[in-house]
Structures are given as structure tokens and as C-alpha cells.
Amino acid sequence: MTPNGHHFRTVIYNAAAVGNLQRIKVFTINSRNDRQWIIDCFNSDQDGRYPLVIAARNGHANVVEYLLEIGADPSVRGVVEFDNENIQGTPPLWAASAAGHIEIVKLLIEKANADVNQATNTRSTPLRGACYDGHLDIVKYLLEKGADPHIPNRHGHTCLMIASYRNKVGIVEELLKTGIDVNKKTERGNTALHDAAESGNVEVVKILLKHGSVLMKDIQGVDPLMGAALSGFLDVLNVLADQMPSGIHKRDALKLLGSTLLDKKMDAMSAMNCWKQSMEVPLHADDLRLVREMETFFEPQEVYEYQREAQNIAQVELLDGNIEAQRMQALVIRERILGGAHTDVHYYLRFRGAVYCDMGQMNRCYDLWKHALELQQKHFAPLYYGTITTLQSFHETFSMSLNDFVNNHHANRNLRVRSSWVKYVFNGVCLELERAAAWTGAPLLEDTECCGKERCQHATEESEYKKLVYVAVHLVNVLERLSLPSAHIDDSDEEKEPKADVRRLMIVCHELHIPLLHHTLEERIPDSNSAELGLPKAAVLEQLLELDLDVNATDKNNDTPMHILLRAREFRKSLVRALLVRGTWLFARNRHGDVVLNVMKRMKALNHANFDDLPLGRHITLAGLVANAMRVKYPKKFVGVEEQMPLELRRFYLAH
């Protein structure tokens, strides 16, 4: 009996990966005429590991030719690695095109009749793969064979856009010969001109303009001119500025470029030069009137230390030598030009705040991050990833700063965390959850930006709720620490009352069906970016339990809060005691059959925990014993008995 083709899959895959044709022939010589064996070995899925795909990726033309001869399917879609990323759903033709193996590309098309437009999971075609790394010969060949240059990937990004971004001049010119739409937009409103400008490719910019490219705004209101300024490319800016109808556009672009050079390139001298150049741009009467209006109606903000935007050369020169004023000027310019909804505005607010934090100026960090949070919650839908990241950063920074303040024996008063700050951020978390509960627009998280990987894993509402609850609970934990004498809290009434409105959190969690106690007692997996990963203080849990939260509520796995707590690497007897006092059912059983009391016994037997001073016997009830016996010892005798029970008793019985 001939062994199943699956049995040889791994050894043949490995041989194909390194181009060992002789080894492949040894294992296929007796089965090459067995169609089912060939299908099992070469054409059936096994974690995306197809011999033909890996041979095409690695450039082994002789292996590819042999595999095609014996019946390997040229349309299979596997997984290959490019630039340290796994590309999912990759056809052999895409792999060969992206890797630059034209001989294999010709083999697949001419001998195997491969589909020239067969795409990956992200809808990237072989032509786009070839454009990425500039394989001009393959691009020309694919176009000759009917490849469609108009097909975008899943984000609407076309072959012309990727070639423009990657500065592949020859490919850009070749694609333009096909009559491709030079002004086609992605889902986010980007054009090929955006990509060329933002990557500083002057020659490509000129070619696109020559072929009719128009300066259009994306969904954030940024045109290619502003894109060049945000990326720090003065030469591109000068080319594009000539396409604008008025001087005010170039003036603003130079201001924005100066802000980029200061914050991104750390080049204060060049930033000042750009700002001075912006004041020398010739303006028409209408432009001058607009500048005067901006100066007249501009409202300075406290967060920027009431600094006004410079509108003439004298005001710019006042900034010379004052680096703090320059930093605030960059933030003022960026928010005025880009608007409060632009992600760069939020990013640089957080960046500058982090710098102040590192300098020991927590109050400045808080003010800037608070402004960023307010803008994000004003302009974005609930659960926007940037908003959640800002809230997480607040929590982590508060925890680390408080640790430093206490560990350094209160030497640096600027590191002190104020309870009013923590309460504000806690209320911000509650507001984000309340916004989600009241949301009636498009499904949340639909506009989540791609993580940049070919196989993007977007967040879920449940995972984002969990993050927010975690932040809220640990902010309460920070407030508890601030109530200790070691925190040296201020004497003001506001600072003396470090209590959060946990009832507000409970209400919104109930509305969103979030298992608050479960998330509170779940220990997070450590990572390098988190300052605090442990369980909360017992006092925090007591605050929640005082709200009469159900300690026997179950989640989707039928876990009670006690089930979750007992899984923690750190055994916290104070938390276990608090749940027991509130009436945790010791015989509660989850979906996997784990009984709370049995878990405790196992932990004790393995010396993972000591329950000696916890009187577990006091918390064992007759009702629990009976329900456990009915469900475990005599399950067949009591089938369906719960249907005759009152609702509360039925819930109790089914939990055991």
C-alpha cells in the first residue's frame, strides 16, 4: 500500500525550500502518477506550507518546473516571508514576482497558465508585488501578459501608489503608459502624489504632475504639499508649492515643515530658518487679509502657555534662542493648520508630554496629554485606538512616577502625582465607555487603521472594553496609594479626597454587559511596555464590592470572579478573603468542570497557596453540597429538575 501523500509533505517542503531537486525526486518517483497522492502532498493545505510556493519564493526554477510537471497546482495559496512578515494567501506567481525571479514567473504563466491577477489575502496582485521592490523586467512582462494595473489592495492602494512611495521611477513611468488613473484615491483619500511627496521622491512627484496629478486632500484634510511638510522634505515642498493658487499654502507648509524639523528631526536651527522663510512668501491682498483675521481672532490656549502663532518676522525672531517657546510654537502651528482631529497633532502632544515627563515635569506632561485626550474624544468614535493608548499611557506614567517619587524619598516634588489628575483620567475612561454605550453610528472599530502587517488583526469591542476596565481599576489602585502617608498628598480639599466615582464605572459596565469583577481580578500577561501588571489592592476590590456586585456572576466560560483570581500567578489571600466574605459559592463549576473548592485544594497540595487561616468550612453551605451532589453524583436522576425550580434557585443549581 502506497503511503499517504500527507506523510511526505514536510520533507518535500523542506527540500523545495532549499532547492534540493534530487531529494524531491527520491520521494516522488514511485507516486508521481498517483493523482490522489499528488493532491495530498502538493495541493492540500497544511498551515500554508506548499512546496511550489516556497520554491517560487526562493528562486528554485528547476524545482518549480519539476513540481508543475508532476501535477502541482499553480493556483495554491500559501504563506511566505518577506521583510520579516508572513504574507498570507500567497500564490506561487506572487511569490516569484515579489522576489524578482523572472524565469519562474515565465514558467508559471507560459507552462502552467497561472492567473496573472491572482492576489494574496490582502488583495495584492503579482504586479503589485513586483512593483514593491522595483522589478521592472517582471512588471513589463506581467503587463504584456494581461496583468491589470488598476487592481488595488484591500485598502485601495494601487500599483502606481506603491511604486511612487518606493521611488521606483522606471516602474512609475511604465505604469503611466497603461493609462492608469493618476488621481485614484485609497479608502483614506490618499493618491500616488501623496505617497511620492510623503517619501520625498522629487523625480516621481514631477512625473506625476506632468501626467496630470492634482493636489487633493485626504480624509484628514492633508494634501501632498502638507504631506511633504509633515515628512520633512523641503525640495518636494518647493515643487508642489508652485502648483498652489495662493502663497498662503506655501506659507503654512513652511510653518508646518519647521514644526516637523523641530519635533521630528530635533533641528531647531533649521526650524527657525523655515519659519523665517514662511514670512518671506509673497502674499496677495486676500492672503494678507486672511493672516490679519487669524491674528485678530486667534485665541491662545493655556495648554500652550498662552503662546500666539507667529505671523511676522519680528514675532519669529522673538523665538530665537528660546527652545521652550519654539516647542510650544510648533504645537500651536500644527493644531491650527491640521486641526484637532489629525493624528499628528495628538502624537506630538503626547511626544512633547513624554519629554517633559522624562525631565521631571509631570504637570506639563499631564496638561499636554489631557489636551490630546480631549481632542481624541471630541473628534473620534468611541474605542478609537489612539484614545485608548492615551488612557493607558496616563495609567502607566502615573504608576511609574509615583514609584519614583516614593522611592526617591520625595526628593523631586515635580514627580508627585496629584489625585485630581488621576480622577480626571478615571472619568475619561468612564466617558469613553459611556460614549460606546450611547453610540448609534457605524459599527465601532470599523475605521481602525491597519497595523501595517499583511495579516492585520483588528481589535474587538470586548478586548477594548477589557483594556479600559483594566485602566480604570488600576487608576483606583493609584488613588489608594495616594491616600497613604508615603504619598505626601497636598493639603487642598480636592487632593485630600482621593476617591474615584466607582459607581459610575459600575453603571456603564452593567449597561455594556462587561464583567467588571472578572476583569478586575484577571492578572495581565507581563510585557515590556506596562508599568503595573499585578492584581489591585484589597481596598480597591472592597470599593467595588460595596456596590453590591455579584461575586457569583459568570462570564462566557462560566467562570466566577474566584475562578479568575485563583489563576493568577500571584496568590493574594486578602482578595480571596474579600470574595469569601461576600458569599462566593465554593462549589461553583465552570465550563471546564473546575470547581472552586477543588481548585483551592489542588493549589494547596502543590504548595502554590496556603489557605490554613481562611476558614473555608464556614463558607460551605448545605445548599452548595446538595447542588454539587445532584450535579456530580446523581446527574441522571435529576435531569431537567431545574425546570421546576424558581429562577434564583435554578441559577444556583446550574452554577454547580
From Swiss-Prot:
It is found in: Cytoplasm. Pathway: Protein modification; protein ubiquitination. Changing D320A: No ced-3-mediated cleavage. One of its GO terms (biological process) is masculinization of hermaphroditic germ-line. GO terms for cellular component: Cul2-RING ubiquitin ligase complex; cytoplasm; protein serine/threonine phosphatase complex; protein-containing complex; ubiquitin ligase complex. Changing D344A: Does not affect ced-3-mediated cleavage. GO terms for molecular function: protein phosphatase binding; ubiquitin-like ligase-substrate adaptor activity. Pfam families: Ank, Ank_2. This is Sex-determining protein fem-1. SMART domains: ANK. ANK repeats lie at residues 47-76, 88-118, 122-151, 155-184, 188-217, 220-250, 557-588. Keywords: ANK repeat, Cytoplasm, Developmental protein, Differentiation, Phosphoprotein, Repeat, Sexual differentiation, TPR repeat, Ubl conjugation pathway. TPR repeats lie at residues 346-379. Belongs to the fem-1 family. Component of a complex containing fem-1, fem-2 and fem-3. Interacts with fem-2 (via N-terminus) and fem-3. Component of the CBC(fem-1) E3 ubiquitin-protein ligase complex, at least composed of cul-2, elc-1, tra-1, fem-1, fem-2 and fem-3; mediates the ubiquitination and subsequent proteasomal degradation of tra-1. Interacts with cul-2. Interacts with tra-1. Interacts (via VHL-box motif) with elc-1. Interacts with sel-10. Interacts with ced-4. Changing D133H: Locomotor defects due to neuronal dysfunction. Difficulty performing omega bends but no defects in reversals. Does not affect fertility. InterPro entries: Ankyrin_rpt, Ankyrin_rpt-contain_sf, TPR-like_helical_dom_sf. Substrate-recognition component of the cullin-RING-based CBC(fem-1) (Cul2-ElonginB-ElonginC) E3 ubiquitin-protein ligase complex of the DesCEND (destruction via C-end degrons) pathway, which recognizes a C-degron located at the extreme C terminus of target proteins, leading to their ubiquitination and degradation. The C-degron recognized by the DesCEND pathway is usually a motif of less than ten residues and can be present in full-length proteins, truncated proteins or proteolytically cleaved forms. Sex-determining protein; essential for the adoption of the male sexual fate in all tissues.
